Amino acid sequence: MLNVRIKGLLKSMEVDAIFLKKWENVRWASGFRGADSYLLCSNEQAFLITDPRYTEQAAVECPEMTIVNWKQRGSIARAAADITNELNIRRLAFEDDAVPYRLYADLCAETGCELFPAGNNVDRLRMVKTQEEIDCLSEACAIACRAFYRIIDDIRPGVTEKELAARLSTYMVFEGADSQQS
């Protein structure tokens, strides 16, 4: 399901869609934990644009989204253009503090959309937590505390920081954390 707050942002910005690049915003809006990905959201659909290394993971983590392999399209901008043309998107917001100029220029040339800087609007949305996000944060804190209490006994002379880091990572997983770092 498309993030309701993103839909509200599209309406308030008076745009047809938004192009996200920051990994933390892509993850927040999509749930995707991989890297090197972009998210193009309209009011009706969300497209996770990624490369072949992540398409399988994306399909599992974001089953409600359309996964687009940008390498098959030739470029990120071309993949975005295919989507914007398909959905008749004319007004596209983008993360102006994250999209490099070259990609911005390519988006302008390829999509034919009028581009609007999103500023920190998505970051600000992400800062205000829902009850579900608060519950997840509480559980993460509980997991971290339990792992920390387990590692205290391992801290002694002769034990390296690398060993402690490896043990702490293991304890975190045993206590219920994701095994994948992000």
Predicted regions and their residues:
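A short coil-to-beta-strand element that immediately follows conserved catalytic motifs
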Residues: A17, S179-S182
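Terminal domain-start leader segments
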Residues: M1-F47, R78, D82-N88, A109, ...
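Short, polar loop motifs at secondary-structure junctions
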Residues: W23, T50-E56, A98-Y104
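Conserved beta-strand termini and adjacent loop/short-helix elements that scaffold enzyme active sites
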Residues: L20-K21, V68-Q72, F116-N120
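Short, structured coil segments at secondary-structure junctions
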Residues: S42, E61-E64, E110-G112
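Flexible, acidic/His-enriched mid-domain "rim/lid" segments that flank
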Residues: L2-R5, S75-Q180
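Compact, glycine/acidic-enriched structural inserts
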Residues: D51-R78
